[in-house]
Regions:
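Bacterial N-terminal signal peptides
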Residues: 10-20
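Boundary at the C-terminal end of the N-terminal hydrophobic targeting segment
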Residues: 24-26
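Extracytoplasmic small-molecule ligand-binding "clamshell" domains
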Residues: 28-120, 312, 323
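Hydrophobic residues within well-ordered alpha-helices
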Residues: 86, 111-112, 162, 204-208, ...
């Protein structure tokens, strides 16, 4: 009886720890979204589509386009395709998705209150956002850095020449602190022009209310496309910060974060092993076990298909690549050198080509 009593006490203690721990971890998440197994995935499956939060009017990354003469609207861009990849893996349909426009203020609010399932809006992974805001950052999909854009009429070639300049930036991002640190380090005086998140900083710059505009360099290149005179604006050479950008999900929902995380890794792995949307069907019944695992062809008790561990079908990763493409395809068609935005891959190459993109083994 004494031993039995100890067992009961131990079980109660374990349950209490689990409950308290779960509450502490999810303290900034609406109680409705504290998962038993994966509340987000269950809700997504029940409704039949993913809700993705993204920016609007962000050429190359996320923008609602009018297609053809029929006036059909369709979201396009790098961040948009990342969300489509999630839908393709879950439903076998990249269009099983709804896009919710977010800004610097609402993006985290919408994620934490359950308005959106995943945030794909050029969001920088930082310590504070991860630890304090209880956000789960997915693998970095775009390695960036903050820079500056100016009018060529100023005749400058470096941010260090901008003594006394008016510099505009969004009040809701990482730009303000980066700019403060940079100009303090170089002992340069400047006039900060903080733009609230419900306004677009690029419009404040275009109106002439500031001399220089600071944000991620990919954002500068994208926003310059929307200017009526893009050739009259210069992106300066300085890169003043690290800005690892990627998708974000709610903290504490392990199954959902695993699905989104391995969706990103599937894009990297497919490029690494040579699979793309055009050739993937030719790799059926291939002798390479790595390709067999990716195609969902290893079955049986010893080698169950890997999708089963996520609650997905055997062909989840095949569908991602067949229907959306690998990382290289997504990058090149949206922001690559042959697009209007014209961004070289740089750090956003696979590690095998000198970049920072690297996925754990799919095994």
């Amino acid at each position: 009886m004494i031993m039995f009593g100890k067992v009961i006490v131990s079980l109660v203690w374990v349950v209490w720890i689990v409950i308290v721990g779960s509450t502490a971890e999810g303290q900034n998440v609406s109680p409705e979204y504290i998962p038993t197994y994966s509340t987000t995935y269950d809700r997504v499956k029940a409704r039949g589509y993913v809700i993705c939060g993204t920016n609007d009017e962000f050429p190359g990354f996320s923008q609602e386009m009018i297609l053809g003469g029929g006036g059909e609207e369709r979201w396009e861009g790098f961040d948009v395709d990342l969300c489509r990849a999630i839908a393709a893996g879950i439903f076998g349909d990249p269009d099983a998705i709804e896009f919710e426009i977010v800004n610097g203020k609402t993006r985290f609010e919408f994620l934490l209150d359950g308005t959106i399932d995943v945030l794909s809006a050029a969001t920088t992974y930082t310590y504070t956002r991860n630890v304090q805001k209880k956000l789960e950052f997915m693998p970095t999909t775009y390695y960036d850095g903050q820079g500056f854009i100016v009018r060529k009429t100023l005749g400058v070639s470096s941010a260090k020449q901008m003594e006394g300049a008016r510099i505009c930036f969004s009040s809701s991002g990482t730009a303000a602190k980066n700019i403060k640190d940079f100009f303090k380090k170089h002992e340069i005086n400047y006039i900060p022009v903080s733009v609230p998140p419900n306004q677009k900083t690029k419009n404040v710059y275009k109106r002439g209310d500031c001399d220089m505009y600071g944000t991620d360099r990919s954002g500068l290149a994208s926003n310059r496309l929307s200017f009526s005179d893009p050739d009259r604006h210069l992106i300066l050479p300085e890169v003043i910060s690290k800005e690892p950008l990627g998708m974000v999900v709610r903290y504490g929902d392990q199954k959902w974060s695993d699905i989104v995380r391995w969706t990103v890794y599937a894009l990297f792995i497919a490029e690494e092993i040579g699979l793309n949307s055009n050739n993937i069907d030719r790799f059926e019944n291939n002798n390479d076990p790595n390709i067999q695992r990716f195609m969902g062809e290893l079955n049986g008790n010893d080698h169950p298909h890997l999708g089963s561990k996520l609650g997905l079908g055997a062909n989840w990763s095949y569908n991602i690549i067949k229907l959306v493409g690998n990382y290289r395809e997504i990058y090149e068609r949206n922001v690559g050198v042959n697009t209007p935005i014209g961004l070289k891959r740089g750090l956003n190459k696979l590690y095998t080509h000198g970049g920072l993109l690297y996925a754990p083994p799919l095994k």
